[in-house]
Amino acid sequence: MKRPERRTLVGLVTSDKMHKTVTVRITTKKLHALYKKYVSRSKKYQAHDEENTARAGDVVRIAESRPLSRRKRWRLVEIVERAK
């Protein structure tokens, strides 16, 4: 039996101060039900960064994984764009 494809998200690294961990902010646009206007919503995820390569301001892709700690359930897949 084939395992289903893991969910991936693209977001901005907001913090790289922890050892082998980065905080990634994912921003989505959602249509407001009453006013029919798009509203920005953001959520923060803790992601595992094995080589400590991501820096604050980088755009990264993260994927779901098994629980790695109390708050970490995502891992860094690739750095899409480096911070300037």
Curated annotation (Swiss-Prot):
Assembly description: Part of the 30S ribosomal subunit.
Pfam family, one: Ribosomal_S17
Domain of life, per lineage: Bacteria
Keywords carried by this UniProt record: Ribonucleoprotein, Ribosomal protein, RNA-binding, rRNA-binding
Leader sequence segment: none
Gene Ontology terms: cellular component: cytosolic small ribosomal subunit
Keyword Glycosyltransferase in record: no
UniProt xrefs under PANTHER family: 40S RIBOSOMAL PROTEIN S11 FAMILY MEMBER, SMALL RIBOSOMAL SUBUNIT PROTEIN US17M
CDD domains the record matches: Ribosomal_uS17
HAMAP family in UniProt: Ribosomal_uS17_B
UniProt lineage: Bacteria, Pseudomonadati, Spirochaetota, Spirochaetia, Spirochaetales
Coiled-coil regions listed: none
Species annotation: Treponema pallidum (strain Nichols)
Gene name of this polypeptide: rpsQ
Record-level Gene Ontology MF annotations: rRNA binding; structural constituent of ribosome
Known function: One of the primary rRNA binding proteins, it binds specifically to the 5'-end of 16S ribosomal RNA.
GO biological process: translation
Protein family membership: Belongs to the universal ribosomal protein uS17 family.
Record protein name field: Small ribosomal subunit protein uS17
